[in-house]
């Protein structure tokens, strides 16, 4: 007859009984004093063998083993029992679930005190067995250990002893223990008893207890009854780890001595609620409720009086809605680490932390709490050193009040990253900030960021700080930001930003790449003269569609790249660049003015790269720039190739001047000038011819004027200006 494992009946994340229900046709396990009782099954009506093993440490009485099939064995006056019994088919008590049960009793004769330790009962693998689960393998269903008079100690229910013995405790369903014991440890006692459904613990224990891993991986466990007096329990680490079917647990209020609750309920997928006892002595709650997917609420009646680690405590408990804390803690100097404590609690809507909780770190504390709308932090947390990722992707958060400033500098990196509904933030006085990267990245609704007087800064980088703050209309950087080295993408995609005030002391900034990229609203910006250290202006004003004018200060003498700096600034009319000395190190202007269709006045563009050895105004580096008709481009740099091809790259230039007449600038095999399909008039082309003629004895060069607007109006005399010098005109 087929055997249905208890595991198959009970292990379910969403269905099955909430408490243990014992089959009515099992033989009764009684509370017999001075006895150890087992109930086991044979997985079918077949011959099977059971081996018992006990260690007797005192006393001299005979040990009687009642095998439950009307036979007994007597072990006399020896310290150790190691007895094997073979059952005959047809004996035992049939069970409606399809197997036969046997009740084994182990007891004593005579008087006096005897002690049994290491009480084990194991199935013997029949020689005909080929795999676990074959009908010849027996399984213990229940176990009862008699009262403390005999002190029978259960140890290692899961152990495998010898190559021919298999642990039968994977199908153990119920365990009842003596009322009074003096055991000092339950560590790993029921570890991996996969089918264990209920355990009744002793009502009294006179010794200090360690429960670490006691029920670890008992994923069918439904019910655990602790004694009402549990004052001596000290270690609860990993006790219920992976008890996936445990739905509720009652922890006695007397369980107030435990120092370690780390990973206690880790992976209890169906646990709904827990009221914690006093945890005054606790120093570890790390991963205590990690990945408790159905957990709805937890109540803390007190908080530790010593420093405690709550890192990852509730992480990924996706259904957690409420955590009750006391209003205050009794020892405000005791620090609490909340690193990633509530990360991934997607149903958590509001939380109130004790007003004087001294949090040492808020790093990632509420990251991905997507339903969080309100969070009341402590009024002060002087030991806090980190706020990085605190509210990362809290997409429902509307407002937050930060605690008073801690004593040390703190990181705000990605603190509000992705808080798309956050509207206002005030940083209180006294904060010393050391990292501001991505702090308000994608805060689409942020309108106001206030720095109260007294905020100090040790910030060296503001990369992506306000990127994507669509509703931010103005911002004034504090004057104390004088050591910031990077503003890369700091204000990019701030679509409503109309004004920004930069401090006069940006002397440490080296990277302004994409700083204002995509700011379609503001029309002008004043850059401070202190930016002498800056080297990177790439994409700085990319797609600033409303920018009409810009003047770069004469102090930016170390810039090396303007790659796509004003790309897509289609309203830009005036751009004033610094002089030759300030632009001498520039080596990349690719796309610098691409799409600047309204640019009329461009000052000092001819000075770019004037002191470098590599020419810039070439097809590779210049042709992607586009200018409005009417602008004048004057070239000064060391040119070996000038390409302004209006057809291929839409370079809409009307006037080109060559200002450097040094013959040394025209070396190479066949350098040429290409102004094809530009809008240059006849007079402007003639003016360019005169510039070319002034190149001294440079001969055998080519100028291509095909398709240029004024090419058709050139006279023979006009052409002679350059051909008489040995130049060739194409077009």
Walk through the language-model features, giving the residues of each:
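Enriched but not universal
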Residues: 1-35
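Structural signature of tandem-repeat unit edges
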Residues: 104-106, 114-159, 168-184, 193-209, ...
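Exposed beta-strand face motif in extracellular beta-rich ectodomains
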Residues: 3, 100-102
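Short beta-strands within extracellular/lumenal beta-sheet-rich domains
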Residues: 22-44, 81-83, 122-129
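Extracellular/surface-exposed low-complexity segments
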Residues: 2-5, 9-13, 710-731
């Amino acid at each position: 007859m087929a055997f249905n494992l208890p595991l198959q009946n009970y292990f379910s994340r969403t269905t099955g009984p909430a408490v243990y229900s014992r089959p009515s046709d099992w033989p009764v396990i009684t509370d017999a004093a001075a006895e150890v009782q087992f109930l086991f099954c044979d997985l079918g009506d077949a011959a099977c063998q059971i081996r018992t093993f006990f260690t007797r440490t005192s006393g001299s009485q005979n040990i009687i083993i009642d095998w439950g099939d009307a036979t007994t064995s007597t072990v006399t006056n020896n310290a150790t029992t190691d007895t094997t019994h073979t059952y005959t088919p047809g004996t035992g008590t049939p069970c409606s679930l399809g197997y036969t049960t046997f009740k084994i009793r182990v007891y004593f004769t005579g008087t006096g005190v005897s002690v049994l330790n290491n009480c084990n009962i194991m199935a013997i693998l029949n020689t005909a067995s080929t795999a676990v689960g074959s009908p010849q393998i027996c399984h213990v269903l229940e176990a009862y250990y008699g009262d403390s008079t005999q002190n029978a100690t259960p140890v290692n229910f899961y152990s495998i002893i010898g190559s021919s013995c298999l642990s039968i405790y994977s199908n153990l369903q119920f365990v009842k223990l003596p009322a009074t014991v003096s055991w000092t440890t339950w560590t790993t006692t029921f570890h991996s008893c996969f089918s264990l459904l209920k355990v009744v613990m002793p009502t009294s224990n006179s010794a200090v207890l360690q429960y670490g891993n006691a029920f670890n991986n008992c994923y069918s466990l439904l019910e655990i009854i602790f004694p009402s007096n549990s004052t001596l329990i000290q270690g609860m680490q990993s006790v219920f780890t992976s008890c996936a079917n445990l739905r509720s647990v009652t922890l006695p209020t007397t369980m107030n001595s435990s120092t370690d609750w780390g990973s206690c309920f880790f992976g209890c997928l169906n646990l709904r609620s827990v009221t914690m006892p006093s945890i005054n002595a606790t120093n570890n709650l790390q991963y205590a409720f990690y990945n408790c997917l159905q957990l709805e609420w937890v109540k803390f009646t007190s908080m530790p009086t010593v420093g405690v680690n709550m890192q990852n405590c509730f992480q990924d408990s996706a259904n957690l809605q409420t955590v009750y804390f006391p209003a205050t803690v009794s020892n405000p100097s005791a620090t609490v680490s909340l690193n990633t404590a509530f990360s991934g609690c997607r149903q958590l809507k509001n939380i109130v932390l004790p007003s004087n909780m001294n949090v040492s770190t808020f790093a990632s504390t509420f990251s991905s709490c997507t339903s969080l709308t309100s969070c009341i932090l402590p009024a002060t947390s002087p030991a806090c050193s980190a706020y990085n990722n605190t509210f990362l992707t809290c997409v429902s958060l509307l407002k937050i009040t930060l605690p008073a400033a801690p004593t040390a500098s703190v990181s705000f990196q990605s603190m509000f990253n992705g808080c798309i509904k956050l509207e206002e933030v005030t940083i209180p006085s006294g904060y010393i900030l050391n990292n501001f990267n991505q702090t308000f990245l994608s805060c689409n609704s942020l309108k106001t960021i206030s720095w109260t007087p007294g905020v100090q800064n040790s910030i060296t980088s503001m990369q992506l700080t306000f990127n994507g703050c669509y509703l931010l209309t103005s911002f004034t950087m504090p004057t104390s930001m004088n050591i910031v080295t990077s503003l890369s993408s700091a204000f990019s995609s701030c679509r409503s930003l109309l004004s920004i005030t930069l401090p006069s002391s940006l002397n440490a900034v080296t990277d302004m790449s994409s700083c204002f990229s995509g700011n379609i609203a503001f029309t002008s910006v004043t850059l401070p003269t202190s930016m002498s250290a800056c080297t990177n202006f790439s994409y700085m004003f990319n797609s600033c569609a409303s920018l009409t004018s810009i003047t770069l200060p004469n102090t930016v003498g170390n810039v090396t790249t303007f790659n796509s700096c004003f790309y897509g600034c289609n309203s830009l009319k005036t751009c004033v660049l610094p002089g030759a000395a300030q632009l001498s190190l520039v080596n990349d202007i690719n796309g610098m003015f691409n799409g600047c269709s309204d640019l009329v006045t461009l000052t000092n563009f001819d000075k770019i790269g004037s002191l470098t050895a590599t020419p810039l105004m070439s097809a590779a580096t210049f042709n992607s720039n586009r200018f409005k008709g009417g602008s004048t481009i004057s070239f000064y740099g060391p040119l070996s190739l000038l390409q302004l091809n209006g057809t291929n790259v839409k370079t809409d230039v009307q006037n080109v001047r060559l200002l450097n007449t040094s013959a040394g600038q025209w070396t190479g095999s066949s350098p040429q000038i290409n102004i094809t399909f530009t809008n240059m008039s006849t007079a402007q082309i003639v003016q360019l011819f005169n510039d070319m003629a002034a190149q001294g004895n440079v001969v055998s060069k080519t100028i291509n004027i095909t398709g240029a607007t004024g090419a058709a109006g050139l006279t023979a005399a006009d052409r002679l200006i350059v051909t008489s010098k040995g130049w060739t005109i194409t077009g």
